[in-house]
Amino acid sequence: MLTIVIGLAAADFITGIIKACVKNDLSSRVMRIGGLHKICEIIVMAVACGLEIGIELLGHYYQAAELAAVSGTVAAGLVFGYIVLMELISILENYGEISPDAVWVLAIIQKLRGFQKEDTKDVQAKTHTTRKRK
């Protein structure tokens, strides 16, 4: 899992640099921040893998190996799935801005952003009503 995350993070970083070169918007500050984000993603995935191993070892210690294996795998799998999805979307966004022929990619990204805005509105509405109740 960690190898895939590292590969996707590198691909996203490289496509981001290509996009910046194509748009004449290359900035060392933006590259530094992007690189730090990628390092944080790799650290989070490494911690999730360590958590999976730790939960499995605890399961063996407490004679609940099957439950521990499942819960550790689910935890690491969810983190892995989120990071992979996030990286793939970012790579597609970069590709859509690099290639003028990638209209289909931009259409998909706009739909995803529409879903994201709706989700954000729902979260903000729930937060606002919760604050009113307090």
Predicted regions and their residues:
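Short, aromatic-rich membrane-interface segments at the entry and exit
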Residues: 1-2
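Alpha-helical transmembrane segments of multi-pass membrane proteins
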Residues: 5-15, 41-52, 79-90
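Membrane interface segments of multi-pass transport proteins and intramembrane proteases
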Residues: 25-29, 60-67, 96-103
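Hydrophobic alpha-helical transmembrane segments
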Residues: 15-27, 31, 84
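Hydrophobic alpha-helical transmembrane segments and immediately flanking/interface helices
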Residues: 57-87
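Juxtamembrane helix-capping/reentrant segments at transmembrane boundaries
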Residues: 25-45
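Membrane-helix exit/interface motif
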Residues: 18-22, 47-63
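Membrane-proximal cytosolic segments adjacent to transmembrane helices
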Residues: 85-134
